[in-house]
């Protein structure tokens, strides 16, 4: 694999020499940093099993190497990487996999270790969505996830990835993560804080990642991280699990932050060792039981993961002074909900008791039941999935609902050819050789729902959202 030149400040190298265990080679560290990062993907088990995915992609000649800490994760090598970006494959467009760095699969593995099965989870710094979508898959779309993102520009990307993967149990918020301890005290069974950091571990992906690095900057970042972990710990219920992670390598932003929390709440913080998380985890194990992953250990990004348990309640923070405002939705009455459910089933959309119908004007939404306790405590950017808009003739079903709720065994499902599917993703109407009988058609490709279409004569009218329309070369190889 080709080398690339990474910029290393001298002070950073000095710091790494001091931080690295004697069992590891510093020369190996430098060599690993100069190698480009291996590509990796995670199969979205909400859409397809790992076995079925491997069978589906077998003809492509992809070399898929299992990632030890994630059963559905694989390092991927392809002969035609330049010819077709992974993001333009049919399997990616339909949400069958997520392009995710192998190290970043570790925090969610830690969150669900030892049979942990939380019902209400918070992802404090969620964009672009790799870990939120991984959490949702582990929860099988049950329970609820509060996915927060401080950066307004990244909330849109977060929602797009959640929607593409067919996730229905997520509420999005846009806050500074430091507000949650006061706003929603002790309300979560599990919390992932993948904290903003100095990014020392990402040089294999970005050779210039350390251009603005300084020890002083690390100290400032660590101060913010302490405030974030304190807030997250307050939002965690007694008995709950907190996973703290970063993609950086210095101890000040990693071990020291966790030790600060334990010093602050000595009777309430228990470190849960991660040495048995996967075979070989002991190679990165610290004396506290954390995983400090230098890039040469597993040939991946540098990363840090700690798992903590809150053993008892702690004093509450002062109540927040902001006002959330009136919640603009109201629950749909049972009789009407039954009618809506019946109409939705007619086009192949079904849901279970984990989701409940709410209404705002002419909009119908499905919210995860386990998020309802947070209504009135935080302001949501987006909650659950938009099911439909009502109009005089019935319902206008929404694309995100189709991707999350439809199953391909519906009587009105219509399987497209590869060429027709590509036309669909380009936002064009489709003219199949044999037109379907039904007027409302559940369009599928590779037996995966990819949208709803109206049959108009011999034409299938495209309803693919404009913002998702693709151009350029796609999976059939035609531009």
From Swiss-Prot:
It is found in: Cytoplasm. It catalyses: cytidine(1407) in 16S rRNA + S-adenosyl-L-methionine = 5-methylcytidine(1407) in 16S rRNA + S-adenosyl-L-homocysteine + H(+). Its EC number is 2.1.1.178. SUPFAM superfamilies: S-adenosyl-L-methionine-dependent methyltransferases (SSF53335). InterPro entries: Methyltr_RsmF_N, MeTrfase_RsmB-F_NOP2_cat, MeTrfase_RsmB-F_NOP2_dom, Nol1_Nop2_Fmu_2, Nop2p, RCMT, rRNA_ssu_MeTfrase_F, RsmB/NOL1/NOP2-like_CS. It comes from the Bacteria. Keywords: Cytoplasm, Methyltransferase, RNA-binding, rRNA processing, S-adenosyl-L-methionine, Transferase. The active site is at 247 (nucleophile). CDD domains: AdoMet_MTases (cd02440). GO terms for biological process: rRNA base methylation. One of its GO terms (molecular function) is RNA binding. GO terms for cellular component: cytoplasm. It holds the Pfam family Methyltranf_PUA. HAMAP family: 16SrRNA_methyltr_F. Specifically methylates the cytosine at position 1407 (m5C1407) of 16S rRNA. This is Ribosomal RNA small subunit methyltransferase F. It comes from Shigella boydii serotype 4 (strain Sb227). The lineage of its organism: Bacteria, Pseudomonadati, Pseudomonadota, Gammaproteobacteria, Enterobacterales.
């Amino acid at each position: 694999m080709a080398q690339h030149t990474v910029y290393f400040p001298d002070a950073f190298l000095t710091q790494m020499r001091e931080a690295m265990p004697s069992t590891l080679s510093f020369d190996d560290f430098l060599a690993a940093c100069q190698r480009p990062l291996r590509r990796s993907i995670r199969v979205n088990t909400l859409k397809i099993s790992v076995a079925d995915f491997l069978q589906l992609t077998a003809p492509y000649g992809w070399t898929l190497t299992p990632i030890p800490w994630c059963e559905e994760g694989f390092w991927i090598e392809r002969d035609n990487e330049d010819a077709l970006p992974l993001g333009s494959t049919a399997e990616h467009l339909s949400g069958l996999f997520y392009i995710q760095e192998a190290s970043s699969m570790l925090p969610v593995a830690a969150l669900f270790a030892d049979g942990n099965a939380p019902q209400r989870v918070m992802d404090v710094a969620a964009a672009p969505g790799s870990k939120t979508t991984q959490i949702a898959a582990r929860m099988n779309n049950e329970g609820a996830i509060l996915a927060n993102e401080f950066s307004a520009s990244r909330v849109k990307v977060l929602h797009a990835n959640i929607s593409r993967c067919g996730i229905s149990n997520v509420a999005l918020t846009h806050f500074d993560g430091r507000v949650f301890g006061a706003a929603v005290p002790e309300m979560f069974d599990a919390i992932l804080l993948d904290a903003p950091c100095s990014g020392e571990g990402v040089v294999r992906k970005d050779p210039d990642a350390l251009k603005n690095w300084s020890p002083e900057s690390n100290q400032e970042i660590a101060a913010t991280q302490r405030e974030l972990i304190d807030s997250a710990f307050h939002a965690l219920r007694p008995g709950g699990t907190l996973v703290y992670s970063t993609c950086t390598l210095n101890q000040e932003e990693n071990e020291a932050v966790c030790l600060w929390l334990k010093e602050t709440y000595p009777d309430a913080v228990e470190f849960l060792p991660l040495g048995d998380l996967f075979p070989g985890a002991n190679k990165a194990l610290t004396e506290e039981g954390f995983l400090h992953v230098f890039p040469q250990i597993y040939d991946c990004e540098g990363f840090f993961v700690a798992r903590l348990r809150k053993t008892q309640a702690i004093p509450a923070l002062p109540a927040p002074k902001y006002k959330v405002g009136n919640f603009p939705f109201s629950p749909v009455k049972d009789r009407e909900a039954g009618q809506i459910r019946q109409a939705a089933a007619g086009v192949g959309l079904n849901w279970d008791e984990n989701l409940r119908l709410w209404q705002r004007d002419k909009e119908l939404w499905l919210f995860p039941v386990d998020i309802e306790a947070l209504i009135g405590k935080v302001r949501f950017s987006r909650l659950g999935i938009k099911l439909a808009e009502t109009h005089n003739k019935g319902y206008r079903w929404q694309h995100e609902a189709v991707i999350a709720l439809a199953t391909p065994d519906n009587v009105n499902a219509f399987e497209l050819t590869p060429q027709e599917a590509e036309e669909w993703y380009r936002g064009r109407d489709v003219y199949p050789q044999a037109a379907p009988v039904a007027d409302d058609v559940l369009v599928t490709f590779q037996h995966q729902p990819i949208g709803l279409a109206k049959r108009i004569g011999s034409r299938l009218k495209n309803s693919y959202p404009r913002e998702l329309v693709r151009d350029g070369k796609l999976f059939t190889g035609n531009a």
